[in-house]
Amino acid sequence: MSSIYLGVNIDHVATLRNARGTQYPDPVHAAEIAERAGADGITIHLREDRRHITDRDVRILRETLQTRMNLEMAVTDEMVEIALQTQPEYVCLVPEKREELTTEGGLDVLGQLERVKAATEKLTAAGIKVSLFIDADREQIDAAKACGAPFIELHTGHYSDAKSDVDQQNELKKIAAAAAYAHDLGITVNAGHGLTYHNVAAIAAIPEIYELNIGHAIIGRAVFDGLAKAVADMKAIMVAARR
């Protein structure tokens, strides 16, 4: 079976730093530890309100990462310009609302097709690989294809938040079907949001999924076990699910 890759989201290291307005813990240091522990890439979300990751973080991480940067951002002129200046390997376009604690759902590509397509084309022309964070919905996948996005990231929040085994299995089936559908269209499929050490294996076992982006669970585990072990343990579960 094909390999699966782990992108470690380090936003919540920045959240902890910003809670006191200090210079520590530094997400740049966290990225270096995560890479040494087996992370295949580092994911960061530069929000419009800069609530965790800052422009400084983006700049230094771009200079120091040994793996690849996946820059999550809203579909705005400001963010597109920052991406063009920064030149990350990947940009993931996500929905964003100031009042939300975290990204609450997938990007409505279908409802803003021309806007997303324009951003995708601009970033692609600069050599940046674009991913669209969407729900496991065929119409949204078709819209992503129409935008020319080579990657999508399937939103796993509904799966992660399911209150019963039946609901979770239903959400898992939706994700698996969406991954297969997108793969058949020639789109590379990533997934993420709300994944934990307890629920990640079933998602990692879906053969069409290329990479999982996971942050909160890893940073939470790192408080008790250390970041290197937290990353290595998550990667081990994912790899075992592919055997």
From Swiss-Prot:
Family membership noted in the UniProt record: Belongs to the PNP synthase family.
**Where is this protein chiefly located?**
cytoplasm
**Kind of enzyme, top EC level?**
transferase
Q: Which GO terms describe its biological process?
A: pyridoxine biosynthetic process
The EC number(s) given in the record are 2.6.99.2
> Which sites bind 3-amino-2-oxopropyl phosphate?
N9, R20, G194, G215, H216
Q: Which reaction does it catalyse?
A: 3-amino-2-oxopropyl phosphate + 1-deoxy-D-xylulose 5-phosphate = pyridoxine 5'-phosphate + phosphate + 2 H2O + H(+)
Annotated protein name in UniProt: Pyridoxine 5'-phosphate synthase
Q: NCBIfam families annotated for this entry?
A: pdxJ, PRK05265.1-1, PRK05265.1-2, PRK05265.1-3, PRK05265.1-5
Please state the pathway this protein functions in, per its UniProt record: Cofactor biosynthesis; pyridoxine 5'-phosphate biosynthesis; pyridoxine 5'-phosphate from D-erythrose 4-phosphate: step 5/5
Q: What molecular function does GO assign, one term?
A: pyridoxine 5'-phosphate synthase activity
For this protein, the record's Gene3D superfamilies field holds: Aldolase class I (3.20.20.70)
Cross-referenced InterPro entries, in alphabetical order? Aldolase_TIM, PyrdxlP_synth_PdxJ, Pyridoxine-5'_phos_synth
What function does the entry list?
Catalyzes the complicated ring closure reaction between the two acyclic compounds 1-deoxy-D-xylulose-5-phosphate (DXP) and 3-amino-2-oxopropyl phosphate (1-amino-acetone-3-phosphate or AAP) to form pyridoxine 5'-phosphate (PNP) and inorganic phosphate.
Keywords, A to Z? Cytoplasm, Pyridoxine biosynthesis, Transferase
Chain coiled-coil ranges:
none
Q: How does it assemble?
A: Homooctamer; tetramer of dimers.
